[in-house]
C-alpha cells in the first residue's frame, strides 16, 4: 500500500499526524524557508512522544544546497546527533556548484548516518540531469528520493516521476512524490504507481494571543501575519490515509 509521509514543522504537528494515521513524519522547522533542521529540544521531544518513524531534516539554512565548510560540518554533527538519539531516518541533500550530486560529501553523510534510512530531499529537483542523479543516489544506497519531478509541484512533474518509478522498479531508491500533493490530486500519484507520498496536509490557524501589538514584527517581511501559524490538519491526514487504503489495489510496485 502507498505510504503517507507528513511534513511537520513542530512536535505538536507530528503528534497530530500520528493520531490521524500518517505512516511517517518528516520533522522540520522554518516553514517559510522550506524546512530547516529542528532544534535539539524538538528532536528530544519527538523521540519521547511520537511512536511512528520520524525523519528529521538536516538543512542548516534556506536557499541553495551547496554548502560552506562550516555548514557541512554542522550538518554532519546534526546527523550524528539524530543517529545517536535513535531516529529511524534522516532527510538531507548536498549539491556541487554545477548542480550535480556532491558525491564526496554525500559519501561522508552516508558514513555518518550509519543505520539511518537516508532520504535525499528536493535538492534532487535542482539537479542538472535527474537520471544521472538517480544513478548516483542508487550507488550511494539512499533509501528514497523526495521529488516533485523537477517541477514547481509534483502534479506538473508526473511525467518525470513515472520515469523515475520505472527506472527503480526492480531496485534503487523509493521515489516519494512531494510538493503540492493533496487529497484532491493524490489519486493521480496512486495510479502512477508511486510508492510513497509526502504532504504537509496543513492549514493556517490563528494565534491564541488576545493582545496583539500593532506595528511591530519579528520578521524581515512586515507583511507576514505573525499572529497565525501553519499546522497539520488531522482531518485532512485521515482523509488522505483513507483514500490510500481504498486505493491500495491500484498502487503498483508496492
UniProtKB/Swiss-Prot annotation:
Where, subcellularly, is it found? Cytoplasm
* Gene3D superfamilies linked to this entry: Copper homeostasis (CutC) domain (3.20.20.380)
What GO annotations for molecular function exist for this entry? copper ion binding
InterPro entries per the record? CutC-like, CutC-like_dom_sf
A GO cellular component entry from the record: cytoplasm
Query: Cytoplasm: is it a keyword of this entry?
Result: yes
The keyword Cytoplasm is annotated on this UniProt entry: yes
Top-rank taxon: Bacteria
Q: What is its main location?
A: cytoplasm
Protein family per UniProt: Belongs to the CutC family.
- What name does UniProt use for this protein? PF03932 family protein CutC
Q: Which organism is it from?
A: Yersinia pseudotuberculosis serotype O:3 (strain YPIII)
Q: What is the lineage of its organism?
A: Bacteria, Pseudomonadati, Pseudomonadota, Gammaproteobacteria, Enterobacterales
Amino acid at each position: 500500500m502507498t505510504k503517507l509521509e507528513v511534513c511537520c514543522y513542530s512536535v505538536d504537528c507530528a503528534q497530530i499526524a500520528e493520531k490521524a494515521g500518517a505512516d511517517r513524519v518528516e520533522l522540520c522547522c522554518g516553514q517559510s524557508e522550506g524546512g530547516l533542521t529542528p532544534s535539539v529540544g524538538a528532536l528530544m521531544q519527538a523521540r519521547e512522544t511520537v511512536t511512528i518513524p520520524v525523519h528529521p531534516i538536516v538543512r542548516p539554512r534556506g536557499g541553495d544546497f551547496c554548502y560552506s565548510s562550516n555548514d557541512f560540518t554542522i550538518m554532519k554533527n546534526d546527523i550524528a546527533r539524530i543517529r545517536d538519539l535513535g531516529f529511524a531516518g534522516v532527510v538531507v541533500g548536498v549539491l556541487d556548484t554545477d548542480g550535480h550530486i556532491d558525491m564526496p560529501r554525500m559519501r561522508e553523510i552516508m558514513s555518518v548516518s550509519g543505520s539511518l534510512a537516508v532520504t535525499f530531499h528536493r535538492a534532487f529537483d535542482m539537479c542538472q540531469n535527474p537520471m544521472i542523479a538517480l544513478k548516483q543516489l542508487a550507488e550511494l544506497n539512499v533509501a528514497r528520493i523526495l521529488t516533485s519531478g523537477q517541477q514547481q509541484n509534483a502534479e506538473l512533474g508526473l511525467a518525470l516521476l513515472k520515469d523515475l518509478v520505472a527506472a527503480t522498479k526492480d531496485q534503487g531508491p523509493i521515489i516519494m512524490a512531494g510538493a503540492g500533493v493533496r487529497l484532491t490530486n493524490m489519486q493521480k500519484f496512486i495510479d502512477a504507481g508511486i510508492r510513497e507520498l509526502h504532504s504537509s496536509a496543513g492549514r493556517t490557524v490563528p494565534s491564541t494571543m488576545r493582545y496583539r501589538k500593532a506595528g511591530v514584527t519579528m520578521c524581515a517581511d512586515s507583511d507576514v501575519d505573525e499572529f497565525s501559524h501553519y499546522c497539520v490538519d488531522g482531518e485532512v491526514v485521515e482523509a488522505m490515509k483513507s483514500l490510500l487504503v481504498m486505493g491500495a489495489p491500484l498502487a503498483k510496485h508496492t
